Design a protein with these regions (language model features):
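Bacterial N-terminal signal peptides
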Residues: 10-20
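Intrinsic disorder/low-complexity segments
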Residues: 5-6, 16, 26, 32
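Calcium-binding acidic motifs and repeat modules
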Residues: 26-180
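Sec/Tat signal peptide C-region and signal peptidase I cleavage site
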Residues: 21-25
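Bacterial N-terminal signal peptides that target proteins for export
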Residues: 1-12
């Protein structure tokens, strides 16, 4: 009986200590939004979408059905050109312009491999998501030590990037839901 009580006590303690880590690792604000965006793109048979985000920032995405979303956001030198392309629904052109000519300091580039939102770490030898933010690259593979980051820094970077990515996805979804 004493052994059974000890086993239960250890199990409860483990769940209490590891529960927050596991739930943090599984929490992704962008996951549901990525699924919604992919569904809208599939329904409309589109492989790209773009939008104006807050202020003078623009966001564009390329979609490879079921496999990946490549999303870029940044400031572009000519707002008139971006607005013209958006008006014509030339989303791929917006994406290309942002990828090549947006201000590096403001550029964010997300490679959502799996098109399922950012994942905290790699799962079972699956590809991992990456982000290039203002000229600095991050790999969300769960290997913060290899990236010369503390676990806390990795968690904070992931949470901030996931929040930012969720906002980009919301802008893209709003574009697709807008009546033509």
């Amino acid at each position: 009986m004493n052994t059974a009580a000890r086993t239960i006590g250890i199990s409860v303690l483990s769940a209490l200590l590891l529960g927050p880590v596991v739930s943090f690792a599984q929490t992704s604000k962008s996951a549901a939004l990525a699924a919604e965006l992919c569904k809208l793109l599939d329904e409309r048979k589109l492989d790209s979408v773009a939008a104006r985000q807050a202020g003078d920032q623009y966001v564009g995405a390329l979609y490879f059905a079921g496999t990946q979303l490549l999303v870029v956001r940044g400031k572009f030198g000519s707002a008139a050109r971006m607005d013209d392309l958006l008006g014509k629904k030339e989303y791929r052109e917006v994406y290309m312009d942002l990828s090549g000519a947006s201000d590096l300091k403001t550029r964010a580039f997300i490679m959502d491999l799996g098109a399922n939102g950012l994942r905290f770490k790699r799962e079972d030898n699956q590809p991992f998501d990456t982000a290039d933010l203002g000229g600095k690259s991050y790999q969300f593979d769960g290997e913060w030590g290899r990236a010369k980051m503390s676990e806390d820094e990795y968690k904070k970077t992931f949470a901030a990037t996931d929040e930012d990515y969720a906002q980009m996805l919301q802008a893209l979804i709003a574009t697709l839901k807008k009546p033509s």
